[in-house]
């Protein structure tokens, strides 16, 4: 079993409190041994850390860090319906990148989320993934990430 909070602490991070939904949904839902999160934005202490489009006023490296924040927020969402320490496999990551027209580096941005999961879970952090470019995101967020994990009973 991995102590997720300890692993986060080792890399200078802490598990945040889950953000309150901005509409009619829940942060995460469990069915069987799977937990699905709602899309998580790069909120820090309830506020958007940066807004706008990647490739305009936000660099790919900044976008990658925002995806990492989204990934942390996904773990916080998992914690609302279970315990992050029961995660046995990162199954799927879906990342949405609000980029300028012609922006095609979505995978580089979403690596910020993927790399965090690999740092924490190693081999069990390997996952299927989609990195999708979009014209806009809620609250003018540059990045949004969804997570599916398998947990033990």
Enumerate the language-model features and the residues they cover.
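Short, polar/acidic, helix-capping and beta-turn segments at strand->helix junctions
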Residues: 1-153
